[in-house]
Structures are given as structure tokens and as C-alpha cells.
């Protein structure tokens, strides 16, 4: 697999924000070498995701004005939200892996399937946010909920922009 696609997959892991998840890497090397390479990449992605998740939480903690009482109630809900977001993120990683594996041989049907499933993942993220608005609002004010989701969306937008800049365009396939 070329370096650009490998970098794409590692960056994709970053976009998923929290928790260790899996990743497969296509390789023409011997199976044992491919397995070792995949394990190393999986570990890199897991560490990167944990680091980004931690930094996101620090960013929110530094910018979201919470009283001690609010913080005690907010952070468990945030952790639950982040865990559900990471599960959706697993689907995003799977799509990026599939895209990387099909790069250079992708058919029209495969391209359409990938974009439809990618949009479905985006929709799931939006639905998760909608689901959590009233849950967060039970523990903090409406303004705080709105501010949290502004930061959450800004953080994700930055990652998405970086990721999009690294993903080769479908029509650019050899």
C-alpha cells in the first residue's frame, strides 16, 4: 500500500477521536509481515485516538464554563456520548479501510455504495447529537449544551478537513 493511503488510514483513526479500534492494512508482503505491520498500525491508531480523545476532553474542559456541581454531572454524560460516538466512528474507519483496499480497482457500484454508507454515518452522528441534547440539558443549562456542541462540532470539523485533504479523490484512481 502506498504511503499516501497508509497516512490516510492513520489520519482516519485520528478522526474517530476516542478509544482503541481496529484497522486493516492491505499489503503485498508475506502474511506474517502484513500481520505484524497491521498490529503496529492498529496500535498507532489506538494510541492516536486515545490522545485525540484526551485532548478533545481537555479542550472542552478548558473552554466550557462548568461549576463543580455541573462538572460532576456533565463528565459522565460526556463519556457516554463519546463512547457512542466512537462506535459510530468504527464504521467510518471501516469505510476508509474499504476505500483504501479498493483504491485503483473501484467500480461505479462500489463508489456509490461507499458514498451512501458514508452519508449514513454522517446522519448517525447528527442523530446522536440530537439524542444527547436533552440528556446534556438534564445536567447543564441550554446555553452550556449549545456551547458544548459548538466545540464538539468545531473539533470534528477540523479533523474532517484534515482527513478530507488526505483522501485521494475517487476519479483520481489509476
Identify what each model region corresponds to.
Residues 13-15, 116, 141, 146:
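Generic secretory/membrane-interface signal
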Residues 17, 82-85, 122, 156-159, ...:
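A short hydrophobic/aromatic micro-motif that marks alpha-helical segments and, especially, helix-coil
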Residues 34-37, 44-47, 51, 126-174:
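Amphipathic, charged alpha-helical segments and their helix-to-coil junctions
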Residues 38, 45-46, 56-139:
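Amphipathic alpha-helical segments
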Amino acid at each position: 500500500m502506498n504511503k499516501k493511503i497508509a497516512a490516510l488510514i492513520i489520519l482516519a483513526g485520528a478522526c474517530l477521536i476516542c478509544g482503541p479500534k481496529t484497522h486493516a492494512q492491505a499489503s503485498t508482503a508475506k502474511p506474517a509481515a502484513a500481520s505484524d505491520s497491521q498490529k503496529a498500525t492498529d496500535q498507532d491508531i489506538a494510541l492516536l485516538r486515545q490522545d485525540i480523545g484526551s485532548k478533545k476532553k481537555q479542550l472542552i474542559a478548558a473552554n466550557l464554563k462548568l461549576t463543580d456541581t455541573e462538572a460532576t454531572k456533565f463528565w459522565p454524560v460526556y463519556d457516554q456520548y463519546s463512547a457512542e460516538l466512537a462506535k459510530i466512528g468504527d464504521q467510518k474507519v471501516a469505510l476508509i479501510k474499504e476505500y483504501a483496499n479498493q483504491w485503483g480497482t473501484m467500480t461505479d457500484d462500489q463508489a456509490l455504495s461507499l458514498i451512501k454508507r458514508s452519508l449514513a454515518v454522517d446522519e448517525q452522528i447528527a442523530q446522536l447529537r440530537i439524542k444527547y441534547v436533552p440528556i446534556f440539558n438534564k445536567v447543564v443549562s441550554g446555553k452550556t449544551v449549545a456551547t458544548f456542541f459548538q466545540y464538539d462540532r468545531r473539533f470534528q470539523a477540523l479533523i474532517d478537513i484534515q482527513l478530507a485533504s488526505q483522501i485521494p479523490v475517487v476519479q483520481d484512481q489509476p
